[in-house]
Amino acid sequence: MKFYKYCASGNDFVITNADRKEDRSALAKELCNRYEGIGADGFIVILPHEKYDFEWEFYNNDGSRAAMCGNGSRAAAHFVHHINKINPNMSFLTGAGVIKAKVNQDKVEVSLGKIKSVQNTFEELGKTWQLCNTGVPHLVHFCQNLDEFDTMLCQKMRQKYNANVNFVKILDENHLKVRTYERGVEDETLACGTGMGACFYLAFLNKKVQNKVKITPKSGEEVGFAYKNEELFFEGKVKYCFEANYNFS
């Protein structure tokens, strides 16, 4: 199997082309293993589609399926344009719906579409939370110090609510910093696109930031978010790392 390794804002992905759908959960887990495989946060399979430019299957690091991944969508768009030679303005089908993307050299902007749902704030484990679905569910906690981020606490919240967990600090009305515990990876990751999107949207909804901001995840790779016409837009750089062939175990 020929594969391509990509990075986007700190998240890394293994991407490959395929001509049909099938259960690749075991393969995803094998490929994403950082000790015995290639190592990645997620595995993306690009499939043909009659109506859209392509369809994808997205697998988490543990082999579970995910409806959506923000950074993964940008990596997939970069791959399909630069490797598969598809038009830079594209649309593709995910488990969370249709995603629109624009590729400009190493920068990719995607529309994550409309926010799926937002719940009221609630208190748990000594902190205030809000749940927002940007394609996948995210718990968000606004804090003054990102050192408050606690992996064990995040694990408890993730298990109870079956959601990703984010801590966000507002630096000013145009800049946020975010740390995310991702389900499917079951640990903190260097970045999470849908998580940053949830943090931005809730901050905007609560009138704490403007409708266009910069966000710095743990990786330090700054990305841009905007909310316009009831859609969430996400832009940042994507890096092609390498390509190789993988022999199945």
UniProtKB/Swiss-Prot annotation:
It is found in: Cytoplasm. The record marks H138, E182 as: Could be important to modulate the pK values of the two catalytic cysteine residues. Substrate binds at N11, N60, G70, N71, N164, E182, R183, G193, T194. Pfam families: DAP_epimerase (PF01678). Its EC number is 5.1.1.7. One of its GO terms (cellular component) is cytosol. Belongs to the diaminopimelate epimerase family. Catalyzes the stereoinversion of LL-2,6-diaminopimelate (L,L-DAP) to meso-diaminopimelate (meso-DAP), a precursor of L-lysine and an essential component of the bacterial peptidoglycan. HAMAP family: DAP_epimerase (MF_00197). NCBIfam families: DapF. This is Diaminopimelate epimerase. It comes from Campylobacter jejuni subsp. jejuni serotype O:6 (strain 81116 / NCTC 11828). The lineage of its organism: Bacteria, Pseudomonadati, Campylobacterota, Epsilonproteobacteria, Campylobacterales. The gene is dapF.
